[in-house]
Amino acid sequence: MVRYMQEHFNSRPEELVAAIGPSICVDCYEVSEEVAEQFREVFPEDVLQPGKAPGKYQLDLWKANQSILLRAGIPPEHMAVTNVCTCHNPEYLFSHRASHGQRGNLAAFLMLKESWVPECLTGIKKI
């Protein structure tokens, strides 16, 4: 997404703001050795923790996504993580694991605060 914004909107990564929304947390996301190995190849950082069972690992998707954003040039101070686990909040959010395969949808509504609107957009009529 960052690369797309650079190519199509001339965005500079250091000026972008990113949010990581609700998803499964590290405590709830157990993965196999095979999945863990694939993540180790891409993320040498600490995105895996020892699992609760032998040969299992807890995967931190929030850290993995922050790592992707850092590599893309987004400064850490321009990132926000909701720290809301979909598995811990099934009454509000859908979780594939918590619902044993039943699925739903999540949506995000984003907007620019007037103070954040870049100069190139200041002439756009407000709704």
Spans of features found by a protein language model:
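Active-site microenvironment for binding and transforming phosphate-containing groups
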Residues: 1-127
